[in-house]
Swiss-Prot record:
It comes from the Bacteria. This is Methylthioribose-1-phosphate isomerase. The lineage of its organism: Bacteria, Bacillati, Chloroflexota, Chloroflexia, Chloroflexales. It comes from Roseiflexus castenholzii (strain DSM 13941 / HLO8). Catalyzes the interconversion of methylthioribose-1-phosphate (MTR-1-P) into methylthioribulose-1-phosphate (MTRu-1-P). One of its GO terms (molecular function) is S-methyl-5-thioribose-1-phosphate isomerase activity. One of its GO terms (biological process) is L-methionine salvage from methylthioadenosine. SUPFAM superfamilies: NagB/RpiA/CoA transferase-like.
Amino acid sequence: MSSAFRTVWWEAGQVCLIDQRLLPNETSVVRCTTVEEVARAIRTMQIRGAPAIGCAAAYGMALAAHHAASTATDGDHQQVYDQLAAAKTILDAQRPTAVNLSWATRRVQEKVRRLIPAAPNTLARAALEEAHAILAEDLAMCYAIGRHGVALIPPRGHVLTHCNAGGLATAGYGTALAPIRMAHEQGRPIHVYVDETRPFLQGARLTAWELLQERIPMTLITDTMAGHFMQRGAIDCVIVGADRIVANGDVANKIGTYSLAVLARAHGIPFYVAAPSSTIDLSLPNGEAIPIEERSPDEVTTCFGRRIAPEGAVAAHPAFDVTPSHLVTAIITECGVIYPPFEEPLRRVVAGSE
């Protein structure tokens, strides 16, 4: 098992990431030297995907700690902690639906808090070590999701996926793409139907790119074609990622996921959600409580810088929707596959990850 590329990493005191807005036509690395630059990269979707932005935010926290330590006196641990608190506020505000973001910043903040009153440089090193740990753990969780999920792929291996829940959305290897990658590595038949995922085209630009890099057979379709291919018997199962899974098993994911779940249920097709424990939020009872990010309508009315709707057209742009738990066949986590009712299994997964 391997990850063909790095999504986000720390290098020479900078947070480095692949600019996903430019893929597949250009591979460019963004180098962030301030918390504000990391926040902007998350907000503008230079990096996206719940686990990946969690990793980026963790490194943003490490960046804040290092900057604070560089100007603090030997005993001024409070300056480091205050800068971390300010950085957490900035980073958490960028993408409200993905719970991995606040989960990661809280982990770094808590790691530093437990070491106070250590010297500022010690606190900064601890922040970076925790960010490295979050990245390594995410990659390990992705591999585990692949191992648990591969058995769910039917023998013919025709899988529909939505948005991008691959290596680009994580520390590497992916969530929804992890079982698919593993099936391919095992030499099993696999063919992926990739929703283009309007309006940001994560499926067309990113998932298709990842699959082609590894020569995994795929067919790109528009979002509105999914029902047709289900009706014709071309789809064996659906596997998607998640940005937040709440206590009852409701799932927030890229807009259009709910529609796929309804279609899958209507056609008797299994609908699987692949996500690490860091995406589970037991503090919210159900999907009605999940904050849904509203992005700029310009992302709907324009495409690659060109307007595709008439002037004056009013557009809506909720970036995510919520799939009710009763439409989810199973959730694939690093701890195993869990089935409804989800409440108790989700609690066990979270408890096992702590």
